[in-house]
Amino acid sequence: AAGAGPAKGSDPKMPNLSDIADVAEALGGKSVLVVEKRCVAVRNRHSSCRKCIEACVADAISVGDNNVKIDAEACVSCGACTVVCPTEALVPVEPADVELASAAAEATRALGGNLSVFACARKAARREGDPDKYVSVPCLARMEESLLLQLASHGVGDVVLVDGTCSTCKFGGTSEGVTA
């Protein structure tokens, strides 16, 4: 019955299947989750921050009228916008940071040392190496400092980023840091 509260013996803090289904539907294949209450441009209409728009090679992001919109059809899922957002208003969903860290730990173990290797999806698609020994990311622009620091805190001494010729990639110039 409506308003009856949680079922006997269930934890009211735990999400139920309905909650999980609602979240899955809201994400609906999106690679980036927008948390508008974190966005400085939403919180302050006079803010000039447009870092996400500048990073987006697909022109899929718009900021205005106190909201942030991502055109899911135009988005190429590179993740560059999530890395440049200073307030983490754009959260990577596919792949999530936890998934990347877990995959990096497995690949590092497979290499038998303290080296982590990340390859852009374009390079990984060429299948030139053992896929158990590197982590594939949509674009190297998705790599952020927090992930690298997390790897270092777990004993990873070296990180290798392998690109697939950024200048001819559909993600183009997502990050000067990648092509530098």
Q: What are the language-model segments listed below?
A:
Residues 1-55, 59, 109-128:
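Ferredoxin-type iron-sulfur electron-transfer modules and their immediate structural context
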